[in-house]
């Protein structure tokens, strides 16, 4: 899988390589030798979002996982199952709904409502929403689902758009930047797509649940180096290198946590779209290390 689109919502797309095609000198010329690495980030998608209502200058808006940005656009993958948790008391008078238009036209395909663990019709859900202790909306996104919207059934203007993508990956709010992530935690591999912001020290969620040891980053919206951040096995410091350069490694600040990874060193500027391939070690499955050559 190679990044073949600059769209932020596309985590990755497959690109076909044809022998002898030349491809502008990039790949597959006759008599030339190439190496290819392929990783499986899983065939299905799913995530639970904690929904709250936040006051933005006097206007109530939904937020997800405490990400302090109003009216974000969600990316959900077709075939993926997503759970929206509205237990927080801020939701009590704001029944969270999904439809095919902003502030109306309820969408029904693949959606189930639960109040206090009991399945409800949409009418029962909205009527009993405020009195319930636990509130859930489950959606399994159908193939070829339309663009959807999330909104409050009582008050207009609280929600935003949901992009339903045929490519895998869904919105992640664990970092300072919203990202689109497809993760296979069992294999210790995550694909992270994001747009660079205008502040320093930006972070993105990776979904692995443990601290990664290496991340490979590349700008998708233009030419750039392949930036690599990694945990140096000799002293556990964080270093960086570039795949396409012969420069020695450099030192950088702490780059990985169990939930986030930093923007790749030297990857891009404000507004650039980036793809990251993030790896963690899995006992009995994968290990990262280093060696010193002896010239033999």
Per-segment meaning from a language model:
Residues 41-45, 55-58, 87-92, 100-105, ...:
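Acidic glycine-/aspartate-rich tracts in secreted/extracellular proteins
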Residues 36-50, 57, 165-190, 280-289:
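Glycine-rich, low-complexity segments
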Residues 54-77:
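N-terminal edge beta-strand
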Residues 43, 182-200, 249-251, 255-296:
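Extracellular receptor-binding modules and their adjoining Ser/Thr/Gly/Asp/Asn-rich linkers
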Residues 24-26, 67-75, 171, 175-177, ...:
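Surface-exposed ligand/attachment interfaces on beta-rich extracellular proteins
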Residues 51, 90-93, 115-168:
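Extracellular/periplasmic metallocenter environments
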Residues 1-8, 12-15:
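Single conserved hydrophobic/aromatic residue that forms the stacking wall/gate
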Residues 31-41, 149-163, 174-175, 212-217, ...:
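Short, structured beta-strand segments at or near domain termini in extracellular proteins/domains
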């Amino acid at each position: 899988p190679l990044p073949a689109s600059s769209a932020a919502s596309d985590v990755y797309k497959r690109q076909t390589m044809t022998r002898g095609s030349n491809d502008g000198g990039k790949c597959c010329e006759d008599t030339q030798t190439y190496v290819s690495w392929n990783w499986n980030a899983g065939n299905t998608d799913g995530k639970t979002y904690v929904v709250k209502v936040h006051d933005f200058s006097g206007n109530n808006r939904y937020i997800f996982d405490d990400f302090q940005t109003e009216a974000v656009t969600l990316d959900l993958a077709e075939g993926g199952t997503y759970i929206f948790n509205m237990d927080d008391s801020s939701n009590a008078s704001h029944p969270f709904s999904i439809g095919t238009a902003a502030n109306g036209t309820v969408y029904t395909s693949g959606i189930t409502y639960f109040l206090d663990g009991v399945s409800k019709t949409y009418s029962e859900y909205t009527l009993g929403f405020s009195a319930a202790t636990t509130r859930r909306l489950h959606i399994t996104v159908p193939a070829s689902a339309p663009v959807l919207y999330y909104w409050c059934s009582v008050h207009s203007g609280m929600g935003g758009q949901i992009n339903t993508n045929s490519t895998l990956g869904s919105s992640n709010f664990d970092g300072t930047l919203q990202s689109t992530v497809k993760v296979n935690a069992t294999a210790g591999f995550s694909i992270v797509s994001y747009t660079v912001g205008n502040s320093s020290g930006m972070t993105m969620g990776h979904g692995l649940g443990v601290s990664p040891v290496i991340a490979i980053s590349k700008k998708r919206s233009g030419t750039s180096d392949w930036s690599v951040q990694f945990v140096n096995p000799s002293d556990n410091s964080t270093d960086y290198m570039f795949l396409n350069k012969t420069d020695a490694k450099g030192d950088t600040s702490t780059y990985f946590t169990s939930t986030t990874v930093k923007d790749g060193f030297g990857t891009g500027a404000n507004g650039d779209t980036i793809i990251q391939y993030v790896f963690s070690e899995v006992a009995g499955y994968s290990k990262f290390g280093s060696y010193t050559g002896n010239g033999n």
